[in-house]
């Protein structure tokens, strides 16, 4: 028998009450985006569960995609069969014979939304249970935590049978918590921060700073590839490339070496905040982890944060590096992140950066520069690209490949 659909059980949506349908509709849109690589697959949702109709598409491929979509608590592949007792008996016997192994226990869980069906739920449980015993006489029934819980649902159009319950990604549907700007470098931490923000329903746009010729086309492609890895959790992501060469050259010329990193990060924060404002974002997200590098001490964070009143979300701030690496490997960004391309945060990194920068000092050094003009020119020069889950590359990547 071939699976015909996958039944979706929602995650935290069950707590949303009045906003429930808004969350469900967003989850439906996200599933349609991610599953768009399977042209025959269709998605339907209602208040209680979702349905992914396979229409002949390979179940295993679709299931792997569903495992990554936030807002799904669990899902079950189902067989669609004709709605009569004889057909149900034969289907249940065939399924149980194929999955049973010595010593396993089972139960039948039947329910019907079509109350015109000839048997009620209790009678159907008994009938199908007897059918299993007739082909597997040594099997034992167990009502609590059986090895096989065969679920039979009688709907208006057909009957559906399932026995697997596969854990989903949990979390909230991407986009239900508003939009945030992810400061995406080429490192290990920021893609993980983006993933964790997506899990809590934040619709992210990736802001990446490029400083050619100091940063290479390879570094830009690396950032594109990291963004594409994140699209499998909720669909398309807008990638925003910011020209940053002029600012970094200005900082290097006008400021003491020990303050280069602090000033660089303050400019990045200003620009990201300006982009957030222009694009109706609510928060800024970054991959800072407390104490990991010089710019991530509390004193440094305070000095950098001082340029904005916008909330800054740091999903990995309390994690050890190995914890972050574990997540990066899980979401398949680690191998990309360790590719040896320098980014804006490393090209002019001082040997001994200031770990406890004073805000008044940073403000004094910034008076040597046209801060507003530099920010305005950077924001005016941004390039926005849509990164899609189904594409192996895009026009910008093709151009980068030519340059490489």
Swiss-Prot record:
Its main location: cytoplasm. ATP binds at residues 183-184, 208-209, 265, 287, 296. It comes from the Bacteria. It catalyses: [ThiI sulfur-carrier protein]-S-sulfanyl-L-cysteine + a uridine in tRNA + 2 reduced [2Fe-2S]-[ferredoxin] + ATP + H(+) = [ThiI sulfur-carrier protein]-L-cysteine + a 4-thiouridine in tRNA + 2 oxidized [2Fe-2S]-[ferredoxin] + AMP + diphosphate; [ThiS sulfur-carrier protein]-C-terminal Gly-Gly-AMP + S-sulfanyl-L-cysteinyl-[cysteine desulfurase] + AH2 = [ThiS sulfur-carrier protein]-C-terminal-Gly-aminoethanethioate + L-cysteinyl-[cysteine desulfurase] + A + AMP + 2 H(+). Residues 60-165 form the THUMP domain. Pathway: Cofactor biosynthesis; thiamine diphosphate biosynthesis. GO terms for cellular component: cytosol. It holds the Pfam family ThiI_fer. SUPFAM superfamilies: Adenine nucleotide alpha hydrolases-like, THUMP domain-like. SMART domains: THUMP. Coiled coil: none annotated. It is an enzyme of class 2 (transferase). Gene3D superfamilies: 3.30.2130.30, HUPs. Keywords: ATP-binding, Cytoplasm, Nucleotide-binding, RNA-binding, Thiamine biosynthesis, Transferase, tRNA-binding. The keyword Chloroplast does not apply. GO terms for biological process: thiamine biosynthetic process; thiamine diphosphate biosynthetic process; thiazole biosynthetic process; tRNA 4-thiouridine biosynthesis. InterPro entries: Rossmann-like_a/b/a_fold, ThiI_AANH, ThiI_fer, ThiI_N, THUMP_dom, THUMP_ThiI, tRNA_STrfase, tRNA_sulfurtransferase_ThiI. It is found in: Cytoplasm. One of its GO terms (molecular function) is tRNA binding. Its EC number is 2.8.1.4. Catalyzes the ATP-dependent transfer of a sulfur to tRNA to produce 4-thiouridine in position 8 of tRNAs, which functions as a near-UV photosensor. Also catalyzes the transfer of sulfur to the sulfur carrier protein ThiS, forming ThiS-thiocarboxylate. This is a step in the synthesis of thiazole, in the thiamine biosynthesis pathway. The sulfur is donated as persulfide by IscS. Belongs to the ThiI family. PANTHER family: TRNA SULFURTRANSFERASE. This is Probable tRNA sulfurtransferase. It comes from Streptococcus agalactiae serotype III (strain NEM316).
């Amino acid at each position: 028998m071939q699976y015909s659909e996958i039944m979706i059980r929602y995650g935290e949506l069950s707590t949303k009450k009045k906003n429930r349908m808004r969350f469900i509709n967003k989850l439906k849109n996200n599933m349609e985006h991610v599953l768009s690589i399977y042209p025959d697959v269709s998605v339907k949702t209602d208040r209680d569960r979702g349905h992914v109709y396979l229409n002949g598409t390979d179940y295993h491929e679709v299931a792997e995609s569903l495992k990554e979509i936030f807002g799904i608590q669990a899902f079950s592949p189902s067989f669609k069969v004709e709605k009569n007792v004889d057909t149900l008996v034969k289907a249940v016997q065939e399924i149980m014979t194929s999955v049973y192994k010595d010593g396993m226990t089972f139960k039948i869980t039947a329910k019907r939304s079509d109350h015109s069906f000839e048997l009620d739920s209790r009678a159907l449980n008994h009938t199908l249970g007897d059918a299993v015993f007739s082909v597997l006489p040594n099997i034992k029934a167990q009502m609590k935590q059986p090895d096989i819980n065969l679920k039979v649902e009688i709907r208006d159009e057909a009957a559906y049978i399932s026995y697997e319950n596969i854990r989903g990604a949990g979390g909230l549907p991407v986009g239900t918590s508003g939009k945030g700007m992810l400061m995406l470098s080429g490192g290990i931490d920021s893609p993980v921060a983006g993933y964790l923000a997506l899990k809590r329903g934040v619709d992210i746009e990736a802001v990446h700073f490029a400083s050619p010729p100091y940063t290479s086309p390879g570094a830009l492609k690396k950032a594109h590839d990291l963004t594409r890895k994140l699209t499998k959790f909720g669909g398309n992501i807008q990638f925003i490339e910011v020209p940053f060469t002029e600012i970094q050259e200005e900082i290097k010329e006008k400021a003491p070496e020990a303050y280069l990193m602090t000033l660089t990060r303050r400019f990045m924060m200003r620009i990201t905040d300006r982009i957030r404002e222009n694009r109706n974002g609510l928060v800024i997200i970054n991959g800072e982890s407390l104490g990991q590098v010089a710019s991530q001490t509390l004193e440094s964070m305070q000095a950098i944060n001082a340029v904005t009143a916008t909330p800054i979300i740091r999903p990995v701030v309390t994690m050890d590096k190995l914890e972050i690496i574990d997540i990066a490997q899980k979401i398949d960004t680690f191998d990309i992140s360790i590719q040896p391309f320098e980014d804006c945060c490393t090209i002019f990194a001082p040997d001994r950066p200031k770990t406890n920068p004073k805000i008044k000092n940073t403000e004094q050094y910034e008076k040597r520069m046209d801060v507003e003009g530099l920010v305005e020119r950077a924001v005016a020069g941004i390039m926005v690209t849509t990164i899609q889950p189904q594409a192996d590359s895009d026009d910008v990547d093709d151009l980068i490949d030519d340059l490489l």
